[in-house]
């Protein structure tokens, strides 16, 4: 059995995340796909004002709800302290001793992999699936993948650039400017606006779309 593990802060989850996971699943054809939001990322500080873990979990579930065969897991949200991937992998390995585990990583995570907690043990347990956001990054992914293979005997699959080159940082920057809705699933964007997350201000076109069903036909031309 193949298990694909896609972890991250998903702060917020955007269409680049879902597009990337589709590319991974098409390449490795996993039997089970787990999307796992982390509680406290070990490699970076959470942005001030980030949603509570329960809010992040809900947004992630909304983002991936239309992806068949994808399960969103809260296994890291119940742990105290930082969310170390090696702990998650060990937990999954204990429950699935014969499974092939595939861990999805982006360019930044791949090139700093030697800084991960207990990274050698992690490399022994998983096949890395490395994704670049741009064609320029893909060359770097290929180079570092080769380095990990030669140095540690790592199993690494390097995939082409993600179809939607956007980051959560980009989305957080755009939302207070009434922009960025095009990078989010409609349900995720609606939740962000309704809960006033990230200092978001509603996109005016989105507001019009929300208002139309509540207006009488003769009023729509004036909106």
What do these predicted regions represent?
Residues 1-223:
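Nucleotidyltransferase catalytic core that binds NTPs
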């Amino acid at each position: 059995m193949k298990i694909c593990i896609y972890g991250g802060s998903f702060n917020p989850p955007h269409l680049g995340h879902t597009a990337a996971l589709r590319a991974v699943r098409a390449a490795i054809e996993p039997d089970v796909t787990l999307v796992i939001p982390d509680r406290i990322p070990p490699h970076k500080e959470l942005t001030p004002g980030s949603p509570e873990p329960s809010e992040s979990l809900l947004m992630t579930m909304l983002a991936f709800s239309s992806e068949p065969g994808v399960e969103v897991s809260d296994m890291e949200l119940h742990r105290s302290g930082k969310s170390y991937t090696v702990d998650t992998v060990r937990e999954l390995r204990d429950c699935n001793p014969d499974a092939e585990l595939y861990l999805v990583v982006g360019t930044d995570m791949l090139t700093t992999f030697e800084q991960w907690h207990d990274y050698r043990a992690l490399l022994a347990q998983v096949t890395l699936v490395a994704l670049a956001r741009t064609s320029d990054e893909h060359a770097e992914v290929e180079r570092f993948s080769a380095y990990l293979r030669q140095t540690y005997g790592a199993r690494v699959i390097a995939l082409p650039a993600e179809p939607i080159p956007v980051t959560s940082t980009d989305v957080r920057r755009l939302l207070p400017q009434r922009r960025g809705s095009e990078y989010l699933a409609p349900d995720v964007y609606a939740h962000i606006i309704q809960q006033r997350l990230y200092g978001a201000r509603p996109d005016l076109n989105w507001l019009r779309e929300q208002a139309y069903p509540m207006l009488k036909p003769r009023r729509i031309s004036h909106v």
